[in-house]
Amino acid sequence: MSDRIDRDVINALIAGHFADPFSVLGMHKTTAGLEVRALLPDATDVWVIEPKTGRKLAKLECLDSRGFFSGVIPRRKNFFRYQLAVVWHGQQNLIDDPYRFGPLIQEMDAWLLSEGTHLRPYETLGAHADTMDGVTGTRFSVWAPNARRVSVVGQFNYWDGRRHPMRLRKESGIWELFIPGAHNGQLYKYEMIDANGNLRLKSDPYAFEAQMRPETASLICGLPEKVVQTEERKKANQFDAPISIYEVHLGSWRRHTDNNFWLSYRELADQLVPYAKWMGFTHLELLPLNEHPFDGSWGYQPTGLYAPTRRFGTRDDFRYFIDAAHAAGLNVILDWVPGHFPTDDFALAEFDGTNLYEHSDPREGYHQDWNTLIYNYGRREVSNFLVGNALYWIERFGIDALRVDAVASMIYRDYSRKEGEWIPNEFGGRENLEAIEFLRNTNRILGEQVSGAVTMAEESTDFPGVSRPQDMGGLGFWYKWNLGWMHDTLDYMKLDPIYRQYHHDKLTFGMLYNYTENFVLPLSHDEVVHGKKSILDRMPGDAWQKFANLRAYYGWMWAFPGKKLLFMGNEFAQGREWNHDASLDWHLLEGGDNWHHGVQRLVRDLNLTYRHHKAMHELDFDPYGFEWLVVDDKERSVLIFVRRDKEGNEIIVASNFTPVPRHDYRFGINQPGKWREILNTDSMHYHGSNAGNGGTVHSDEIASHGRQHSLSLTLPPLATIWLVREAE
């Protein structure tokens, strides 16, 4: 036989060190005719088969006892479809040869992936069930440009890296292979000889499903069908919509009482979804559900960005949960972590033996606070991986919004770093220009492709224009968490009321910058961990005063301009900090009616009242929607303002942050007439003292605070009241 393969090539193939298997394996034209070569470890006999007739065309010669076979097909000149009949351990198996198939990735896809402009890279990369030339199987593609060899290993080939080495597309650095017979539900990984000659096993960055920790294999499963955005869901995200978010960690919202094990996605659909709906929330926000190895990271150190965690069920179970939320009228927000990833060896870290996804210099690529690695946003393929992921969750799962975690750590090169521990940008500044461009590009693409979905930024500095359009120099987010408001108001509320008069500005300062961004007011998971205490436990005084303070604070928060966010457990005033390894303290709501029931009823009424009255949400980001009536009564710690809708209808909000009732408290108003109390956090319904105004109160033509008409109210102790003007 001519064109005999060099012994060194055979040795390299068998040892798994040969980078170009398609140049040797499969069908080739040689001077002797059509030659078929195959690497089939442990096989004893191999024939080339005519598929239509089952006729044996030629027996391949075993050139190496370790499994290398070769043979010339007599009387054939042109390539044709064939199969291999392989005898393993005395049993014959009919297989299709993976090395008879041509390149998989189309030239346009390869070009877009290399340019980093492929809108949906997950439709090409990863594992996809496919049929090629009438043969069913799975096509695998992975970006690893510096690897010396990459193989697919899995349940279909005994996890043997010799059996399925891949083809390198040099123009893109992508390795590809179609494996006949590999099917949905099978586990796989990529085995590679990395740039340094080390053998590595890597999970698929684009895996759509993965094993539950501590196992780390990827799972073949098809792309989920696209989810249509409904007009109702789009409207629920808009600036003038009532948005009240229930933030949830699925692993600890509620657990099975007999074994402390998690509820499944489907059980959560049956329990969490109706509860959130009954409580009057409009949105569910889920702490990250991308696959992650460490429970204690709460999902914020993901290794499988395209795979919903298997802790609570399958990918389809997660889709069922989202569908249930939508059916209940709830939009779903997913916490998304494009800022960093963990150092676990099976995942993205040094993926092909080089710093492929991360920066090579630890001053740029290592986050010392979290022992994680920082994405290299300036690398086109990395940015494309992340932008595509954002679109994937919205298009393929029906996620309505993404809340982007730790934006400040992305956009500042010196974030949490001392002098000398960071590298300035090309202009000598501290901004991470590549990260800023990545965020702008992500928000632009989402706005173009899925216009009803929105993004929210957790950004802890005063970086300008986070929620402003890109053409105005902004980052292009729709909303930004108002962490300054949260810190100021909690600092105020934890004070003994006798000292609050000296810190009055902590409640008023937020309005000085309120219209610089589109704010969400967050009482998030970060405020009930790491020794900060629960929200309830931060309130001063005895038990009665703690609950009264909390109710007054919630009444203030729900009335203040901005969308609302409350972490689970806070809606019924859980007394201890959040523990991700245990259920919420639902036992607090067992037995007779108590203060916890009162807070729960209040939050429900706040949500329902807030949603019903447009004045409370329609003009959150328009100065016309808010006006102070009493802003300077710091001696009595009283604050009064109005919220206003587009038609000029007003709601008066009055807060008394001392335990002293204020009788006959007079203040000027804009609209004379009869005002009805629609919410009172001191109501007996919420286990308050039930002080108030007997339902309605009429204005007087008595000048006050620079206005011709005024109201005289009873302001209950440690309470917030809302009043609406009734038609004459």
Swiss-Prot record:
Pathway: Glycan biosynthesis; glycogen biosynthesis. GO terms for cellular component: cytosol. This is 1,4-alpha-glucan branching enzyme GlgB. GO terms for molecular function: 1,4-alpha-glucan branching enzyme activity; cation binding; hydrolase activity, hydrolyzing O-glycosyl compounds. Pfam families: Alpha-amylase, Alpha-amylase_C, CBM_48, GlgB_N. The gene is glgB. Monomer. It comes from the Bacteria. The keyword Glycosyltransferase applies. Belongs to the glycosyl hydrolase 13 family. GlgB subfamily. Catalyzes the formation of the alpha-1,6-glucosidic linkages in glycogen by scission of a 1,4-alpha-linked oligosaccharide from growing alpha-1,4-glucan chains and the subsequent attachment of the oligosaccharide to the alpha-1,6 position. It catalyses: Transfers a segment of a (1->4)-alpha-D-glucan chain to a primary hydroxy group in a similar glucan chain. Keywords: Carbohydrate metabolism, Glycogen biosynthesis, Glycogen metabolism, Glycosyltransferase, Transferase. InterPro entries: A-amylase/branching_C, Branching_enzy, GlgB, GlgB_N, GlgB_N_E_set_prok, Glyco_hydro_13_cat_dom, Glyco_hydro_13_N, Glyco_hydro_b.
